[in-house]
Structures are given as structure tokens and as C-alpha cells.
A protein has these predicted regions:
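Interhelical loop and helix-boundary elements at the membrane-water interface
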Residues: 1, 23-37, 63-74, 110-137
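Helix-coil boundary and interhelical linker segments in multi-pass alpha-helical membrane proteins
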Residues: 1-13, 44-51, 85-98
Length: 137
């Protein structure tokens, strides 16, 4: 492996282990978070340009709906597209694209209960976060 590929692989491996450790922590009975914040932090370090596009998607959906999980899922789904289009700021790495796809699918998987609540109209919306459209009275 060339040094650049090795650097990317090591970053991805660290990010993958951090996300999995957050979602399935050994000392908390393998019940943790949903991996969004940890994954976002990792992507900021690995592919800051792609992270920016994902963050914009998060803010847009959060501002429209007030639903954090919808923003998180949107950001995750934007990530592989942003990486594929070169927003990572470097030539598209198959390893990075693969990790972005995995992370997107994993975030959707960890939010499956939230998706059910969204579909039923039961997911909690934070009205104060709905800054892009009028507040409900």
C-alpha cells in the first residue's frame, strides 16, 4: 500500500472502531448511542468538505422539521454522495467512499425506531429548532 492509502485506511479504521464502540459499548451492556456525533467527528477529520455538506443537510432538515433524527439521517445519506462528488477535498478514495456508505447505512439502521415514529407521525419535534418555517400555534 502506498503511504496515502495507508493513512486513509488507518483513519477509517479508527473512525469505524470509535463509532462501533460508541454504539455498542462493552461496559454499558452494548447499549450506546446512535453513532451520529462520533461519526460526524470522524468525518470532520477525514473528509471536512463532505462533512460540511452533511452538516448543511442536517441544519436544513432540522430547521424545517425540528426533528433531530430526521436531520441526522439526512446528513448520513448526504455523506456518501458528497464523498463521491469529490467534496472530501481529495481524489475519491474507494475506501473512503465505502466507509461513507457504511456509515450512512449504519446510521439509518441505528435510527430504525425513529423512522417508524416519523412514519407514524409520533417522533418528537422540537418546535424551537424549526427556524426555517413558521411555528405551530
Amino acid at each position: 500500500l502506498d503511504p496515502q492509502t495507508l493513512r486513509v485506511l488507518l483513519r477509517i479504521a479508527g473512525a469505524l472502531l470509535a463509532v462501533l464502540g460508541h454504539v455498542y459499548p462493552v461496559f454499558a451492556g452494548f447499549r450506546g448511542g446512535k453513532g451520529v456525533a462520533t461519526g460526524a467527528g470522524a468525518i470532520i477529520l477525514i473528509a471536512p468538505g463532505a462533512a460540511l455538506f452533511s452538516a448543511l443537510g442536517f441544519v436544513l432538515v432540522l430547521g424545517l422539521t425540528g426533528i433531530v433524527s430526521a436531520g441526522s439521517i439526512t446528513a448520513a445519506l448526504i455523506l456518501p454522495v458528497a464523498v463521491a462528488l469529490g467534496a472530501a477535498g481529495r481524489p475519491v478514495s474507494a475506501w473512503l467512499l465505502g466507509f461513507a456508505i457504511f456509515l450512512a447505512l449504519f446510521v439509518v439502521y441505528t435510527h430504525r425506531a425513529n423512522l417508524g415514529r416519523i412514519a407514524r407521525g409520533e417522533e418528537k419535534a422540537f418546535e424551537k429548532l424549526r427556524f426555517l418555517r413558521g411555528r405551530r400555534k
